[in-house]
Regions:
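Conserved beta-hairpin
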Residues: 70-88
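C-terminal "cap" of GNAT-fold acetyltransferases
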Residues: 160-176
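Conserved acetyl-CoA binding element of GNAT-fold acetyltransferases
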Residues: 95-108, 113-114, 166
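A short beta-loop-alpha structural element at the N-terminal edge
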Residues: 24-41, 50
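Conserved beta-strand-loop-alpha-helix junction that forms the acyl-donor binding cleft
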Residues: 128-148, 159-162
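Conserved acetyl-CoA-binding loop-helix of GNAT-fold acetyltransferases
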Residues: 110-124, 145, 149
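Active-site rim helix/loop that mediates acceptor-substrate recognition in acyltransferases
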Residues: 51-71, 123-124
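A conserved beta-strand-loop-helix scaffold within acyl/acetyltransferase catalytic domains
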Residues: 85-94, 158
Length: 176
């Protein structure tokens, strides 16, 4: 999910990327407020539960807050906003950022693309930070499996509003 590294097919779009692979047209663009409404109304159930448990807010407000507090992008699948993700500052001096991703059931429908794109795009999220952290609902099994697959380290269980969450981090990889 590194928009700056994707090859454009067609016209040039500053800050936008488009690619086609035997299926839907997928574009990664800077996140906008209207994307929050579109994704929020259709957010997958596990993400709706997680944003309520972590911040006591609904899906649209969770996306708006996350977008305001980070550099955020939206994944458009066939022109429709389906996934929003970003990285914000947690501790600038220590080089720690907060990474997040929320989406619709399009993640499940396009799981092969999603796994490949997130694995390929992960290094591009480390532009300002050496470490990326966040917490995930312990009951969100799919997200825990995905984070483990990406190489996240699970640090500890924490309590957030009476619900168990798992603190995770990912470190910038260095080529030796």
């Amino acid at each position: 999910l590194r928009p700056e590294l994707r090859e454009n097919k067609g016209t040039e779009h500053v800050g936008e990327q488009e690619f086609v692979r035997h299926g839907p047209v997928i574009r990664i663009v800077p996140a906008r407020g209207k994307h929050c409404r579109s994704i929020g109304r259709r957010m997958r159930a596990s993400d709706v539960t997680e944003v309520w448990r972590s911040g006591r807010v609904g899906p649209v407000e969770a996306l708006r807050r996350s977008m305001r507090q980070s550099t955020a992008f939206t994944v458009l699948i066939d022109g429709r906003p389906e996934i929003m993700y970003g990285v914000g500052d947690l501790n600038v001096l220590a080089g720690v950022g907060g990474v997040w991703l929320l989406g619709t059931d399009a993640i499940t429908r396009n799981w092969r693309w999603f796994l490949r794109a997130t694995a390929e795009g992960l290094p591009g999220l480390f532009t300002r930070h050496e470490v990326l952290r966040n917490a995930v609902d312990r009951e969100n099994a799919a997200s825990l499996r995905w984070l483990e697959w990406l190489g996240a380290a699970f640090l500890m269980e924490i309590d957030v509003h009476g619900h168990p969450f798992v603190l995770f981090e990912m470190r910038k990889r260095r080529d030796v």
